[in-house]
Regions:
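Short amphipathic helix-loop junctions that connect adjacent transmembrane helices
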Residues: 1-9
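Helix-to-loop junctions at the C-terminal end of transmembrane segments
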Residues: 23-35, 121
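Cytoplasmic membrane-interface "Motif A"-like loop-to-helix N-cap segments
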Residues: 33-44
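C-terminal ends and interior cores of transmembrane alpha-helices
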Residues: 45-58
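Intracellular juxtamembrane helix-capping segments at the cytosolic ends
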Residues: 76-90
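A membrane-interface helix-boundary motif in multi-pass transporters
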Residues: 121-148
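Multi-pass alpha-helical transporter architecture, strongest
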Residues: 139-167
Length: 167
């Protein structure tokens, strides 16, 4: 809103959410045919491509398309990876594994994310005032950092793919 100057970003957000949700339903059928493990890599790559496109997006239409790609990849990868966690959870250990999952999927990102985001955003010379507080305007560098961190998630997926091929 502040960086790109879109007055009505709600329309953009609505388009992105509706289109990516529809695409997820359609692509869910592909995931069902190919399997979750084989679909995990392309889903994460799709999300990463969307993030790098968001880094370069400056117009409403390019931002919308990039957002749809990023969000579709995010929704599919979240669905696929969450179901894989359930698939690989040993019987009787569901509570323990879900607790560990919550630590890595919720707690650590909630602690580390604001620090990383703040580090990237502080380099911005643009500011805005919200409720009397001057804040730095988030810049596209947030998406570049997200892209790089998303690539790290491919490392365990490589091992999962190897394991799947061996069995």
């Amino acid at each position: 809103q502040n960086y790109l100057g879109f007055d009505n970003y709600v329309v953009l957000l609505g388009i992105v959410l509706v289109l990516s949700s529809v695409l997820c339903v359609v692509l869910g059928k592909v995931v069902d045919k190919r399997g979750r493990v084989r679909s995990s890599f392309p889903a994460v790559i799709l999300m990463a491509i969307g993030m790098i496109l968001m880094f370069f997006a400056r117009s409403f239409i390019v931002t919308t398309i990039s957002g749809v790609i990023m969000m579709t990849g995010y929704l599919i990868s979240t669905s696929v990876l969450s179901s894989l966690v359930r698939d690989y959870t040993p019987k009787g250990k569901e509570g323990e594994i879900q607790g560990v999952r919550m630590i890595f999927q919720v707690m650590i990102p909630m602690i580390v994310g604001p620090f990383l985001g703040s580090f990237v955003i502080k380099g911005s010379s643009l500011t805005y005032t919200e409720l009397g507080v001057v804040k730095s305007v988030p810049t596209p560098r947030v998406f570049l950092l997200s892209f790089l961190l998303t690539l790290l998630s491919l490392i365990p997926l490589v091992f999962l793919h190897r394991r799947e091929r061996r069995s």
